Structures are given as structure tokens and as C-alpha cells.
């Protein structure tokens, strides 16, 4: 008797499922297309700081000739490093209230008070060897005339970067085009206006 009841319950369930499928089916010719237009997908956005709403990471520069880098996000934390060069490019890698965690060209990281940073874009000339000089051209082309040769560590103002390999820079006594890959302070393929 028990087996008969189970078989009956299973039969009822199978019949109900089949009836549901048949009820949803429509005769040929009466089927309606249910294609919906594809939803537009926004391109991925870079992460933004929880305080500023600006992209993180991003490059900025030091606003003052004396900037303390702390080991934590408050003046009560020990000073890790003292920068003495206004205009030095640094990378903001995190935000906490009025403090920004930065990284310098040598990879040193720490916290700086936000008002000691500027949105002015600068780049530091990089070279493989200390005596290596980086050519500055009169146009964005390796075949252009070399107007100057810049030493490693020279800081230049980024006026514009094409995002295609070249930046127009200015500094004390020079202006011209330099390969974007020879500057620390701008991302590869980043466009700067």
C-alpha cells in the first residue's frame, strides 16, 4: 500500500509539471518574440577616494619646500621622512579623512596632510644609470632636434601628455618633448591636458 501511495504521488507531480510546461507552450505561429534591447554597460571606472571622490591612485606634487611624511594619518605619528623640494611628484595611494597616503619615486610610503599636496602635475626624469642623460626634443619624435639633455632627478612641469608616448614639459631653462616612459609622475598611456 505504501509503495502504491508513493507511486501515485510521483505520478501526480510528474503530471503537474507536464501540464505547466504545456500551459506555457503556444502553437507555432503564435509565439511572440521576447527579445529585449541590450542594456548599455558603462565602462569600468577607476576606484575613487572615499574622501575626495578623485581617482586613487593618482599623481600630485608637493606644495611646499618642507613636507613631513608621517608613519600614520595624524600629526601625532612619528615623522618618517622630510621632503624639501616643492613640486616633487608623488602618488596618492589611499585617503583617510584629511590625510593622504603617498608613494615617492623611490617607493617610500607614508602619510601627508592633504593641504601640503597640489594638483599641479610634475614629472621626475628617470634614467637607468646616474650618468645617463635623457634627450629633450623640439617635437614629439625621436627624429626631432635634441634641444637639451636632462639628468636623472630633474623635475619638470607636465604641460601635456599625449597618452601615446610623449609629454611636453617645461622647467628652468628648458622646454620640449620627452618620452613618457622616462618620467615618474605620469602613468603609461595617461593623457594629461
Give, region by region, the residue ranges found by the protein language model.
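SH3-family beta-barrel domains
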Residues: 27-71, 82-86, 93-96, 103-105, ...
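Bacterial N-terminal signal peptides that target proteins for export
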Residues: 1-11
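Beta-strand-rich domains and repeat architectures in extracellular enzymes and scaffolds
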Residues: 78-79
Amino acid at each position: 500500500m505504501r509503495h502504491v501511495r508513493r507511486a501515485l504521488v510521483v505520478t501526480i507531480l510528474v503530471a503537474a509539471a507536464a501540464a505547466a510546461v504545456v500551459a506555457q507552450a503556444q502553437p507555432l505561429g503564435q509565439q511572440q518574440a521576447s527579445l529585449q534591447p541590450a542594456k548599455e554597460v558603462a565602462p569600468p571606472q577607476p576606484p575613487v577616494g572615499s574622501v575626495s571622490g578623485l581617482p586613487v591612485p593618482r599623481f600630485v606634487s608637493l606644495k611646499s619646500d618642507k613636507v613631513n611624511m608621517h608613519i600614520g594619518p595624524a600629526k601625532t605619528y612619528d615623522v618618517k621622512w622630510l621632503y624639501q623640494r616643492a613640486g616633487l611628484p608623488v602618488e596618492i595611494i589611499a585617503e583617510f579623512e584629511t590625510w593622504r597616503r603617498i608613494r615617492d619615486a623611490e617607493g617610500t610610503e607614508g602619510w601627508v596632510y592633504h593641504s601640503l599636496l597640489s594638483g599641479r602635475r610634475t614629472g621626475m626624469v628617470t634614467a637607468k644609470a646616474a650618468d645617463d642623460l635623457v634627450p629633450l626634443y623640439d617635437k614629439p619624435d625621436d627624429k626631432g632636434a635634441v634641444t637639451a639633455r636632462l639628468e636623472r632627478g630633474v623635475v619638470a612641469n607636465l604641460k601635456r601628455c599625449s597618452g601615446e608616448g610623449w609629454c611636453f614639459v617645461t622647467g628652468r631653462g628648458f622646454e620640449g618633448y620627452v618620452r613618457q616612459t622616462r618620467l615618474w609622475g605620469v602613468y603609461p598611456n595617461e593623457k594629461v591636458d
